Amino acid sequence: MAVGKNKRLSKGKKGLKKRVVDPFTRKEWFDIKAPTTFENRAVGKTLINKSTGLKNAADGLKGRVIEVNLADLQGSEDHAYRKVKLRVDEVQGKNLLTNFHGIDFTSDKLRSLVRKWQSLVEANVTVKTADDYYLRVFAIAFTKRQPNQVKKTTYAQSSKLREIRKKMMEIMQREVSNSTLAQLTQKLIPEVIGREIEKSTQTIFPLQNVHIRKVKLLKQPKFDLGNLMSLHGEGASEEKGKKVSSGFKDVVLESV
């Protein structure tokens, strides 16, 4: 008779348990700081495994993208329908210095805008900012009832929609190409470009709910620590940034 190993009889001693190691003992927390473009700079915290040997924690944090609600950054629920993406570019002690990486609408807001009896106009353009960031900017708009209109629907003709789309692309191209990334962020928060499109297309067809619904970063220039530090001010640990006014105006330099 062949003799084999009886698994039932070869169990270890009763009462001995495997030692459980808390995984958080090997991790450390870092504070995420938003640029001074936003009113509240303290975004939150993130964690990563501690530096061991040749493996540096800072290398794993650089390039990490964090999504934050704009209402938290501005301290106002009026901006709750927009999400901002921030990218970690530099690690200073326990602070992570971030830069703007994109903006988007929440899905519930986007769905609430689409209704019956009106035309939807969408346009997008790929453009380079004044400081060499390549962005793809998406705009959305809807037709609205004209004064004293009796007709139920507000559909626009295809020729009118083409004119509106062309005007939207022209305005987006102009506004983005003449601004740095920080200046563009200041325009996006109070919806300056959307209001400009709405005003410029009044002669073609009246519009409503005109928004820059999404900005996507395609390519960024070579990393410059000086530019990043200027975005975060001299004190990178400050909790408050600059308040963006709702009536943003471009600074016009007088000719010398």
Swiss-Prot record:
Modified residues (N-acetylalanine): 2
HAMAP family on file: Ribosomal_eS1_euk (MF_03122)
GO cellular component, one term: cytosolic small ribosomal subunit
Description of how the protein assembles with itself and partners: Component of the small ribosomal subunit. Mature ribosomes consist of a small (40S) and a large (60S) subunit. The 40S subunit contains about 33 different proteins and 1 molecule of RNA (18S). The 60S subunit contains about 49 different proteins and 3 molecules of RNA (25S, 5.8S and 5S).
BP GO terms, sorted: translation
Protein's UniProt keywords contain Cytoplasm: yes
InterPro entries membership: Ribosomal_eS1, Ribosomal_eS1_euk
Record keywords: Acetylation, Cytoplasm, Ribonucleoprotein, Ribosomal protein
Family to which the UniProt record says this protein belongs: Belongs to the eukaryotic ribosomal protein eS1 family.
Gene field: RPS1
Localization per Swiss-Prot or TrEMBL: Cytoplasm
GO molecular function: structural constituent of ribosome
Record-given protein name: Small ribosomal subunit protein eS1
